[in-house]
Amino acid sequence: MKRVVLFLFTNLAVMLVLSVSARVLGVDRFLTGNGLDMGMLLLFAALIGFGGSFISLLMSKTMAKWSTGARVIQQPANQNEVWLVDTVSQLSKKAGLAMPEVAIYDGAPNAFATGPSKSRSLVAVSTGLLQSMDRKQVEAVLAHEVAHIDNGDMVTLTLIQGVLNTFVIFLSRVIAYAIDSFLRSDDDESGSPGIGYWISSIIFEIMFGILASVVVMYFSRKREYRADAGAAVLLGDRRPMIDALRALGGLQAGQLPKEMAASGIAGGGMMALFSSHPPLESRIAALESAR
């Protein structure tokens, strides 16, 4: 669950920084100097929107390591680490992928995969998961994460987020301009945006950004089903994945940092719309009904 929420929070932070920078540099004054230039605004929104999204993608692996304190296994220190690295290597070869970095972090049961591309990825598992599951179940979890990489889920979510960012920036500024025009005095003929524009655009950018996360989480839930199915294919059997999900259902799944929530093996939210993962029961049912 970690992967997506980390991506969302990083994306929001980058977007706000880029937006503020654009204001400081006078881009908004250029766009609104002689009325709102819709064409230029849309181009500006796309540049900032996709730029922020891809910057977040490039930072994803570094941010994941930092936020969890994950330790990349350079030289396995014990038999468990040897097995972990070998298992990820075998699964990656089956999927036709380059070997990802393998990491361990302290925490309750969970795991995640992230990275800017299939050839520069990271698979991390918690000490809690390694201690509470048997090796067949852990292998299934690793297969699920490798399937995420193979499916290109981070790039897919980046493109979705880029489109949503574009609309967030565009709509927030259109509405902010309308509010500013309404509040502006009839005697003000400067044409420059006032304080109402600055405040409104920031407020609406945050509000629409939160609403956009609902769409991202919807796609994240769909990708979880695909990763479960991909794990079953890599293992040649759906039962280990089902057993792993059932085991997770009986454990207190680890809460990954908010910014990483959507890339874990387990996750969810208080509200279904903001949940990065489907219910475990639904995932098990989907695997059991698959042919």
Curated annotation (Swiss-Prot):
Note accompanying the cofactor annotation: Binds 1 zinc ion per subunit.
Keyword Chaperone tagged: no
Bilayer topology term: Multi-pass membrane protein
EC annotation from Swiss-Prot or TrEMBL: 3.4.24.-
GO cellular component: plasma membrane
Keyword check for Disulfide bond: no
Localisation per UniProt entry: Cell inner membrane
Positions of the catalytic residues: E145
Positions bound to Zn(2+): H144, H148, E224
GO terms of biological process kind: proteolysis
Annotated CDD domains: M48B_HtpX_like
Protein keywords: Cell inner membrane, Cell membrane, Hydrolase, Membrane, Metal-binding, Metalloprotease, Protease, Transmembrane, Transmembrane helix, Zinc
InterPro entries for the chain: HtpX_protease, Pept_M48_protease_HtpX, Peptidase_M48
Cofactor(s) demanded: Zn(2+)
GO molecular function, one term: zinc ion binding
Bilayer-crossing regions: 4-24, 38-58, 159-179, 199-219
Family in the record: Belongs to the peptidase M48B family.
PANTHER family registered for this protein in UniProt: PROTEASE HTPX
Entry-linked HAMAP family: Pept_M48_protease_HtpX
Protein name: Protease HtpX homolog
